[in-house]
Amino acid sequence: MSLNTNADRLVTQVLTGEVWPALGDRHGYRTDADGVPFLLPGMGGVTLGVHPGDRAAGYAADHLEPGLSIRHRDERANMALQFLACVGNTVTVRSGPASGVTGRVIGQHAYVLADFAEEELSGVCTGDQVTVHARGQGLRLLEHRDVVVKNVDPELLEALGVETGSAGKLVVPAAVRVPAEAVGAGAGMYSEYANTDLMGAYAGQGEDLSLGLEGLRIGDVVVLEDQDHRYGRGFRAGYTTIGVISTGHCRLFGHGPGPSTILSGPSGAFDIHLDAAANLSTAFAGSGVSV
């Protein structure tokens, strides 16, 4: 059954930002879990070659941010961008050679992250202005009052196949179940800000670090077991959080591919259907909007 929501009462705010450059300092190097120093590309700028549906781990990168990394120069305006931009929202480039091209928000990290078609990404420069049609915060599931919704465009939620099942539970197709022990950096923060890094996906490093998550893909819908993200991020037995993988490979210990939260509530409220196709790439294609 289709979802009964308050989507008709949501408003859309047009927010502005710019493509933020990759940053560094003169010291450069970090160290991984085994004390090995590294200097690799990661956050910020325009990152080519990685999109929803592509693997999240195994790159020569640290804190990989696919597509465009977007923020605002004013601190408070930037926090509004972080808190109000939702996965699935439309992003439009407003300046530079690629002006007019559109993409989709795929999550939050240090920046708001947006995916575009590869040929369009290659025309975008750092400093280019963008707008985000922010819609989704305040969404409620009227027949699932125990489940908190956040950071997701209501149209995308339906495109992901989330619906009310015959038993009255919230049916959620998901690609992977993630054990609570995988949760790393990001715990304790607001769940409307940045994301949660998952340990155990250190592809190419020691097998003793593996939690079997090396197969995660950008855009995967994942189930975070015993995680309560309703009013923050923390461990709570008997609770489930649903997220979308928005960032990729990390070498820094305690970090990893990260899901942006979209649903959270008591585990008994959910009916999880494991499906390898539960990914933003499938949902975007099914909604008729390609990026």
Range-by-range predicted roles:
Residues 4, 8-291:
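Conserved mixed alpha/beta catalytic, RNA-binding, or beta-rich assembly cores of soluble enzyme
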